[in-house]
Amino acid sequence: MTDTQPPMEWPNFADIPLEEALPMSRPKGQALSRFIWWDGEIRKAEKQSVHYYANALHYGTAVFEGIRVYPTSRGPALFRVKDHMRRLLGSARLYGMSIPYGVSELSQGAVQVTRQNGINHAYIRPLAFFGYGPIDIKPKQACAVTVFIATRELGTFLGEKALRNGARVTISSWRKFHHSSMPTMAKASGHYANSVLAAHEALDRGYDDAILLNQDGTVSSATGENVFFVREGQLCTNDETSSIVPGITRDTILRLAEEAGVRISIKAFTREEMMRAEEIFLTGTAAEVTPVREIDGVEFRTGKDTLGARLQRAYLATVTGKDARHHDWLTWV
């Protein structure tokens, strides 16, 4: 449902037109790394392998991040790379992984592998995993931890049409696991089996993505994104008690909205509250800021004058360096 209401005014937005904010020449494919950062060294990606008895392959004992590289007027830049690496180390601690690298070393590794692969618009995947060892669910006793940082080209995640016009989303029949069962704040590979079930269900129903509810019926997240909605000019999202991964894109949007003077509510919300919203959008490193135009046949506002669209433009202007107020979030290659 396109926007037919008069635009609300937020005078502090650096409101750059979408065509200007969008990075130019987004890659259409997902070409892989020629080089990879592997335990502190740049190596040829084709030479690296994982043992078929690696603990992570059997039990999902890996933690990871996703970081975007964007083209800017000063060359390619990584967005909030240090924040991503801090979260990686936090996830590793929750799973008992000992990683011998700090935030600075890992961030520099991401810069090095980006430079070595000669890319300017990509997705970076740092991943730490428990490797070869006995068949055991106590991997920290006997399995070495390997850390690698790989890259691949990535344009839009849910598609150019969804980014511009909105995604079609369904409410999954699968529920999100509770934060008392698993550390939902950790970005761990095993956790995403839950998301795979929901994503496959959405695919089978003909939708772009799915939103998962918690056991109590409150909203958790989409398959890999945080959920925002707008009602009466107020921006709403849920908090950590809703079993979410507190996204770095989510944090960026909240900070940009606060700077613009937008009223914000951060608390658990129900499916009913979300479905009464005027507009809904999803945020994530891969998905960026993607509007939702429909949930199970119910339409929501989209269009250039919605708050979500303004935040989308502000976000894209920030990650590409066009809005200089947050150059401190960019690490140039």
Feature-to-residue mapping (PLM):
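Short, acidic/charged, Gly/Pro-enriched secondary-structure junctions
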Residues: 107-121, 125-134, 152
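Helix-start/capping segments and mature chain N-termini
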Residues: 1-101, 108-112, 135-333
